[in-house]
């Protein structure tokens, strides 16, 4: 019965949802049946109940719907069909059961007791509990009908295993040693253990019972309750189980309460129980019963003392009150006096404030008067009224401006005198008469009129100039050059590029040849890249002149030398290189005129070209042609002026001091700001200096129909990858590319030099670093990553298709060829046809490329050029868009690049786009370039050196530049979105519409591509941080900390700042040319040597004392005085000088010490000494070994007064030198250290020479080991250490670099004394090679092969 109830409960728990769902479905079908009516009768099949609970629910449902048979006819039919199926199954079951019962033997007896034992045993086994022995000793019950095989066990007796430990111990004679053990009085422990175990097991069983345990009674079925009613005994078993569980859990509490109760009753019984408390035995145990209370009796003496104490307190209180009253009166008096004093001070302060306000008002009035006067002076200066300006300046008494004006006037006067001197010198050479100038004429002389005193009007070009007709501005340029010629001066023709400086120079030569009858010879010096163009121009414009083109191979030049020697030519056209190479031939002529093209090459007055021309060549006139007369600073402009007019501009310092002040905003901590008046005054004086000797016209002035040139600065964002790399390089001067990456250190760090250059590379494109591309794009294929990782490429990805669609052609200028390689991949990916020209392009290829690009129907869209190689001598006006990918430090290089397209012949507006990365080093470079252009604008452009602009125009232009410098707006800081970019790029409204359309098409294509990849939105155009590989997203501070050295001590070391490198010019050049040493190492080496020299001079060594304390004899002091030596000691030594001198005589008996005196002349040898120390040599000069005092000749010392350093060394031989030149040597008891050192060296050297031939033989055999593939010597890579410049990280990663030459050197000088040390050094060399190079590389393989060879060699020679 219990089993059936449990089965019923489990069935209800497990299958109730299924039956409920089935009944719900039947109910829904019944409702649907009622709605359908008689139209159609669907059949419903109810699944058979799988438990009695489901059957009961089906009965409940059947009873419930019997009251409404019409509405539930279909459901009733389905339930009755189910009941029929159940009845049929029951009949089948009973039939099978009867068949089974009939098959059982009639004589079989059912043993209920045995079955119960079997069940109990199974339950015990289920709980992993041992079965008791009496369960195992069951009688053997066999069925008579069953047949068994009888086995004879007579031969084999089973082994009896006893579980009784005591019995087994007793049988073995192992009785317990504790014979006096007493049994517990509270029962059997085994019984207690079994009871506790059963209680815990029962608690576990009750806790594991399900929470939804319920009981179902058949009485409720008979009462026909609905399914929503709860059973009357639903929670009976659950409550009983909870009561039993809580009762069992109370057992511990009951035990503790019982223990407390027993303890409390037993311990408090004699206090709480009356008859025990009143017992005499209990009372006797209490001490209080036996003690009598003490009676306190007052004493008279104590009373008297108390009264005396009270009187004393009252007396003191009165005295204190009197004292307080006196102090309060004093305080009141002081407060009264203070208030009176404060009121007096307040009146004084008020009077002072009135006086100060009066003085401030007077100062303001005076300031207004000064400003009003300054404005009047400025107005007079602008109106060019010099007399009024000087009068106002004299009234103002402005000493600063007066001094400035006086100095500039003196400089202009000196220049005027120099101009006259040069003109007079030229006149004397030509035999003309020199007219003296009076003082009155000197004061009224105009500087420009002095220079161009002789004027000559030119209306037509020379007849032998037949190549074409000169334009008006070219005739004016010819007229200016002829005026210089007439006035015996030289000048600079600085017309903007494209205005025909070449033609004007040829016209000057033809004019002098035809009109002035000056038959030359003329020398024209040009760059090699433009000599072809000059040759063509001479052939076209002046074919009648006998022109020699001096260039080519030595044989070609040799064939022309005879013609040059005899002077059978009119013009010699050559290059800078041959001017220097063949100066012995070319400098023999007295040249009539020297013309130098691209004259900014002469900006360095100390260059070899300037030196050669100035010192070897003789010429009557000089002319410099340059489109950029001022590229960086004013001294470069002075260098050009000094070259053409050496007599006039002969002091660079004077020129820079007076005219560089308004532009030199750096160089001192306190910046000297000039007022607008001072700036105008200085610049006007500078214009006065330059105007006679410099002519510059701009294309926009002389060619009015030339289209405009519009330059726009486009700001580009940094991608996530660029930001990470930029911060790494900025903070650590290195990149973290992950451990194991080729080219990086063991920790994955790639150290780099020249931080600014590396930052520029990162701004251009991160893939310039191969290690970065290997991590981000391992396949190195062309994909969207090319523009997603770089902001500039992302911008070009949006811009270039628009230019292509609108028919514009693009010139793109770069500073780095690596970026050009990446751009080529990008253009190929975008299917844009391009051409490339850089420094490696040959001259003949350049001409072909220019012709192909400039062809009328050329299909080339883009021309990639390097700024330095493609910025000169190219005509590319068929393109109308120039993109400056990265800005050059020299802004004139970018201007030259822009003028490739903006030149005469251009028909479209030229749009210049300069790409600048936001918040990067490129902004600093651009700012610096703008400063250089600003100087050029103020000095050159504002001068309007075209000989026709008025003073008002010059002043207006100059004022506009100065105002724009102070009020420069930063409206181009933010990056441009698509709409703003289209506004910038579009040259018309139609292009704006076209560009907007292209942007929409691009966005639609990006959405389609994202959808094809399964993305909801397109990825950002620039790669983000979360898309980068893990290497670039982790915190790299720890990696860089590992590379750094450990800090020394707890005190932070101060960083030492050096303001020079300490190298001479020769040492600097040697360091630059040395491949085995970087410039930083050379500077560091030089500083260490200088520090050692300083310590040696000060005497601060480990075994030296910086005092003169122990001078042994008085004769030594007199010796120093007689030879006029002065000892140079530290401040501490000087402080104790008198004391130590007095003690010297008394200490003569102490051990002798060495005094080493080093004169200032020894400093010449410090470089050699430091070099020998750094190389590890132990060289000691013989003079130092043999003598302790080095003294120079007395006569020389008296003249030069050399500074001496006195060094006192302990435990050394003392050598004294008397006035007569004799030496006295005092030897210590022990052997001389010098002899010991010499003996030790001799012994070491002889021992090292013993192994050196053997090692040399080993090296020779190693060098004979050749590779099987290409037969290269395996030792070739190990001969010397790699270059520090090429492999700077090698010396950071490898702790002990080693090479064959180092091993041979160490063997030769005795560092290695045994073959074992040589073997270890070779092993170190091979380990370094295997550690630094990848496994499988040829260096790695060579190291393994050589290692095997040396191991075999050492085994043979060790035996």
From Swiss-Prot:
> Annotated region Disordered: where?
1090-1246
What is the organism field in this record? Saccharomyces cerevisiae (strain ATCC 204508 / S288c)
EC numbers, comma separated: 3.6.4.12
Q: What is this protein called?
A: Nuclear protein STH1/NPS1
What gene is it encoded by? STH1
In which family does this protein belong, per the annotation?
Belongs to the SNF2/RAD54 helicase family.
Which Cys pairs are S-S linked? none
Q: Where is the signal peptide?
A: none
Q: Which reaction does it catalyse?
A: ATP + H2O = ADP + phosphate + H(+)
């Amino acid at each position: 019965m219990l089993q059936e109830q449990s089965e019923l409960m489990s069935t209800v728990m497990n299958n109730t949802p299924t039956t409920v769902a089935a009944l719900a479905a039947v109910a829904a079908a019944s409702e649907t049946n009622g709605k359908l009516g008689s139209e159609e009768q669907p059949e419903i099949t109810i699944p058979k109940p799988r438990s009695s609970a489901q059957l009961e629910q089906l009965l409940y449902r059947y009873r419930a719907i019997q009251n409404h048979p019409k509405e539930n006819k279909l459901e009733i039919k389905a339930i009755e069909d189910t009941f029929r199926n159940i009845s049929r199954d029951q009949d089948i079951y009973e039939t099978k059961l009867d068949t089974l019962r009939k098959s059982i033997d009639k004589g079989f007896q059912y043993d209920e007791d045995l079955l119960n034992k079997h069940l109990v045993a199974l339950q015990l086994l289920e709980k992993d509990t041992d079965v008791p022995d009496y369960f195992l000793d069951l009688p053997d019950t066999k069925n008579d009908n069953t047949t068994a095989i009888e086995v004879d066990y007579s031969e084999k007796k089973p082994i009896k295993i006893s579980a009784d430990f005591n019995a087994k111990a007793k049988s073995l004679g192992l009785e317990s040693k504790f014979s006096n053990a007493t049994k517990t009085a509270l029962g059997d422990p085994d019984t207690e253990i079994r009871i506790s175990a059963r209680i815990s097991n029962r608690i576990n069983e009750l806790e594991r019972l399900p929470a939804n345990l319920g009981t179902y009674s058949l009485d409720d079925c008979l009462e026909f309750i609905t399914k929503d009613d709860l059973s009357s005994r639903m929670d009976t078993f659950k409550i009983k189980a909870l009561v039993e569980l809580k009762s069992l859990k109370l057992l511990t509490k009951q035990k503790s309460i019982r223990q407390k109760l027993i303890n409390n009753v037993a311990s408090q019984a004699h206090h709480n129980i009356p008859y025990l408390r009143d017992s005499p035995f209990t009372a006797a145990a209490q001490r209080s019963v036996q003690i009598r209370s003490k009676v306190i009796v007052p004493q008279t003496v104590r009373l008297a003392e108390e009264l005396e104490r009270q009187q004393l307190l009252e007396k003191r209180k009165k005295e204190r009150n009197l004292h307080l009253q006196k102090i309060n009166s004093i305080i009141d008096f002081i407060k009264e006096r203070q208030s009176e004093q404060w009121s007096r001070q307040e009146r004084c302060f008020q009077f002072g404030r009135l006086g100060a306000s009066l003085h401030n008002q007077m100062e303001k009035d005076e300031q207004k008067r000064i400003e009003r006067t300054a404005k009047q002076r400025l107005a007079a200066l602008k109106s060019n009224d010099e007399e009024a300006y000087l009068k106002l300046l004299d009234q103002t008494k402005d000493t600063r401006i007066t001094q400035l004006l006086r100095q500039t006037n003196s400089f202009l006067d000196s220049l005027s005198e120099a101009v006259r001197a040069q003109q007079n010198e030229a006149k004397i050479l030509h035999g003309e008469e020199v007219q003296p100038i009076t003082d009155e004429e000197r004061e009224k002389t105009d500087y420009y009129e002095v220079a161009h005193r002789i004027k000559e009007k030119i209306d037509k070009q020379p007849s032998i100039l037949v190549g074409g007709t000169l334009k008006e501005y070219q005739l004016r340029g010819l007229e200016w050059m002829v005026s210089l010629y007439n006035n015996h001066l030289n000048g600079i023709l600085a017309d903007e590029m494209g205005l025909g400086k070449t033609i004007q120079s040829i016209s000057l030569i033809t004019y002098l040849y035809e009109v002035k009858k000056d038959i030359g010879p003329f020398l024209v010096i040009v760059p090699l890249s433009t000599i072809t163009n000059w040759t063509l121009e001479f052939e076209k414009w002046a074919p009648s002149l006998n022109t020699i083109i001096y260039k080519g191979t030595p044989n070609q030049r040799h064939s022309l030398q005879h013609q040059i020697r005899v002077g059978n030519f009119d013009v010699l056209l050559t290059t800078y290189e041959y001017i220097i190479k063949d100066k012995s031939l070319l400098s023999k002529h007295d040249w009539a005129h020297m013309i130098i093209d691209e004259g900014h090459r002469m900006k360095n007055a100390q260059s070899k070209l300037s030196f050669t021309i100035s010192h070897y060549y003789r010429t009557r006139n000089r002319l410099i042609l340059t489109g950029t007369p001022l590229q960086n600073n004013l001294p470069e402009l002075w260098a050009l002026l000094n070259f053409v007019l050496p007599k006039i501009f002969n002091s660079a310092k004077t020129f820079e001091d007076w005219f560089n002040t308004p532009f030199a905003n750096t160089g001192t901590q306190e910046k000297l700001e000039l007022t607008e008046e001072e700036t105008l005054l200085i610049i006007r004086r500078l214009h006065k200096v330059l105007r006679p000797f410099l002519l510059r016209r701009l294309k926009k002035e002389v060619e009015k129909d030339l289209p405009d040139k519009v330059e726009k600065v486009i700001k580009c964002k940094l991608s996530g990858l660029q930001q990470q790399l930029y911060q790494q390089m900025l903070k650590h001067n290195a990149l973290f590319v992950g451990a194991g990456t080729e080219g990086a250190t063991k920790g994955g760090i790639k150290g780099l030099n020249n931080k600014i250059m590396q930052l520029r590379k990162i701004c251009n494109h991160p893939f310039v670093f191969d290690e970065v591309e290997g991590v981000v794009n391992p396949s190195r294929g062309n994909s969207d990553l090319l523009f997603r990782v770089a902001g500039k490429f992302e911008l070009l990805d949006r811009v270039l298709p628009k230019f292509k669609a609108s028919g514009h052609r693009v010139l793109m200028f770069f500073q780095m060829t690596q970026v050009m390689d990446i751009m080529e991949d990008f253009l190929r990916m975008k299917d844009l046809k391009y051409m490339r020209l850089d420094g490696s392009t040959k001259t003949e290829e350049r001409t072909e490329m220019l012709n192909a690009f400039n062809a009328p129907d050329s299909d080339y869209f883009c021309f990639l050029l390097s700024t330095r190689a493609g910025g000169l001598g190219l005509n590319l006006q068929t393109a109308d868009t120039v993109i400056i990918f990265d800005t050059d430090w020299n802004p004139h290089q970018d201007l030259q690049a822009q003028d490739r397209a903006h030149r005469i012949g251009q028909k479209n507006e030229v749009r210049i786009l300069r790409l600048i990365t936001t918040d990067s080093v490129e902004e600093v470079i651009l700012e610096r370039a703008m400063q250089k252009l600003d100087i050029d604008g103020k000095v050159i452009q504002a001068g309007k050196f075209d000989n026709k602009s008025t003073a008002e125009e010059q002043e207006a232009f100059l004022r506009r530049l100065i105002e724009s410098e102070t009020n420069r707006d930063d409206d181009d800081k933010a990056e441009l979105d698509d709409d703003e970019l289209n506004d910038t790029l579009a040259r018309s409204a139609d292009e704006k519409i076209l560009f907007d359309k292209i942007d929409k098409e691009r966005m639609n294509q990006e959405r389609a591509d994202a959808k094809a990849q399964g993305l909801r939105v397109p990825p950002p155009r620039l790669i983000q941080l979360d898309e980068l590989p893990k290497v670039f997203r982790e915190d790299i501070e720890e990696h860089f900390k590992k590379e750094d050295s450990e800090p020394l001590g707890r005190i932070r070391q101060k960083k030492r700042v050096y303001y020079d490198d300490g190298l001479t010019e020769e040492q600097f050049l040697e360091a630059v040319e040395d491949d085995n040493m970087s410039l930083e190492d050379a500077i560091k080496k030089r500083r260490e040597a200088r520090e050692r020299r300083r310590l040696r001079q000060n005497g601060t060594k480990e075994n030296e004392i910086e005092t003169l304390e122990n001078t042994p004899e008085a004769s030594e002091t007199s010796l120093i005085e007689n030879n006029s030596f002065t000892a140079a000691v530290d401040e501490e030594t000087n402080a104790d000088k008198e004391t130590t001198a007095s003690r010297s005589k008394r200490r003569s008996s102490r051990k002798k010490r060495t005094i080493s005196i080093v004169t200032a002349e020894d400093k010449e040898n410090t470089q050699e000494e430091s070099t020998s120390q750094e190389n590890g040599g132990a060289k000691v000069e013989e003079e130092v070994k043999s003598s302790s005092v080095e003294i120079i000749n007395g006569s020389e010392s008296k003249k030069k007064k050399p500074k001496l350093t006195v060094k006192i060394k302990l435990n050394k031989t003392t050598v004294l030198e008397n006035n007569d030149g004799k030496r006295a040597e005092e030897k210590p008891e022990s052997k001389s250290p010098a002899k010991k050192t010499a003996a030790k060296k001799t012994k070491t050297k002889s021992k090292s020479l013993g192994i050196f031939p053997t090692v040399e033989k080993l090296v020779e055999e190693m060098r004979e080991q050749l590779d099987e593939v290409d037969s290269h010597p395996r030792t070739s890579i190990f001969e010397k250490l790699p270059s520090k410049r090429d492999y700077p990280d090698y010396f950071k990663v490898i702790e002990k670099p080693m090479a064959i030459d180092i091993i041979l050197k160490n063997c030769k000088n005795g560092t290695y004394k045994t073959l074992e040390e040589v073997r270890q050094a070779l092993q170190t060399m091979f380990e370094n090679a295997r550690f630094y190079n990848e496994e499988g590389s040829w260096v790695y393989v060579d190291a393994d092969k050589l290692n095997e060879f040396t191991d075999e060699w050492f085994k043979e020679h060790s035996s």
